[in-house]
Amino acid sequence: MKLSTPDISDKYPEAKALKPILKNLGGRQSFFGPIETLKCPDDNSFVKEQLNSSGDGKILVVDANGIDTVALLGDMIAEAGVKNGWSGIVINGYIRDLDIIGTLDIGVQALGTMPVRSEKKNQGEVGVDISFGGITFKSGD
């Protein structure tokens, strides 16, 4: 039996829902799995590193503080996520290469699109608690 998000919300009233700030931008409209968290406001070095590692059906949840001056995900990094078995990517920030990412078999949710790539400063924090959209995300949830 397939459950929709409203069905899950009805069945588990204690479950919290993210405020409707993100858009579905990937080729897979629904996805699930344990999460890995990442905080990196304007540098996608760690996004690339994580998606180039084995995903085993996980979801990468990235807090970019909603920064709208650069994109943290492009087609090549998203393709690495598909190749390495990630179920999805959720970004409190922006992506680029929508025409390609929208065809990939991976869930992608983000605030929108921005064509400018991020700098590569190798900055970020993996596995830390992050909060956005009224939800706190913890690695392993």
Where would I find each of the regions flagged by the language model?
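Feature captures the catalytic cores and cofactor-binding loops of soluble hydro-lyases/lyases
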Residues: 1-138
